[in-house]
Amino acid sequence: MRVGTDAITVTQPVSPVTGSLLTRVKSRLYLRSRRKATHLLDGHYASIHRGRSLDFDDLREYVPGDAVADIDWKASARAQTTLIRRWADERRHRVMFIVDTGRNMAAHSLGGDLKRDIAVTVTGTLGYLAVRHGDEVGLIAGDSSTVRARPFRSSEAALERMLRDIHDDSSLQSPVSSTEALLDRARATLRHRSLVVVVTDEIDLSERLEAQIVALSAQHELVWVEVLDADPTAMVQGQGRVFDVDGEWQMPSMLRDNSRLRREFAEQYATRRERMRELLEHRGVSVARIGRHEDAVPQLLRALKARQHARR
């Protein structure tokens, strides 16, 4: 029996979204239970681009996640607060989001959320931090049929339009996903070194994809965000029909309790995951693996910490 890891969903109604998507993201960021992690994420984002030039322009207040080596202790003592040297090469940077909006992203994640909604949360979180720090954000999004791009901008209004593209373009009626098509566009259009954030689901590592990851990680700071697939063998009774969004193959309910199916699925899943992990680790790519909304901030924090440490 061959068990794949294609995108799985269940037949449940999806309510349309009204209002600002960015406002929803910010509301999640500043919930009392997540505020500390959000401030840490903000600090690590601020540090990720920072170099070590010989001169510094001015001082600013310390943010959790800043490097201790950047603290100006004398100035801090005079000001009665912890101050950080702002190095001369701290300038406006660019963050390019490469987001899969194909049919696969309209499926459910490991935690039950729609993958496209997690993609909105990830892009909105990092995009909001970037705009807060005066950086520019851009978007390359699409599927196997169409790839669209939004130019670099540094406003919340522009970020809101990007989030709306991600949300509205991904549905069960969309063409199938093609991360390779998005990465081809990125390689053709990104001329200057940028922070590139790829948001996709768990895809198989082809020779083409491997070559793209090697090329992009050599030219850019690369962060790979993997939205975790639902486990078709773990779907419970009463959730509705379980089917593969690519081929619309429906899983018979009797197979969900098949021990052989579970074992083969777990083996193939582990093999795919290990191949991808080895490549990304070898190329120095930071990885965030997110299965639900609540995982977004801690996993992004972990990825930016790894990115920051890798540059030292």
Regions found by a protein language model. Give the residues of each.
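Exposed, interaction-prone extracellular/peripheral surfaces
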Residues: 2-51, 56, 60-69, 75, ...
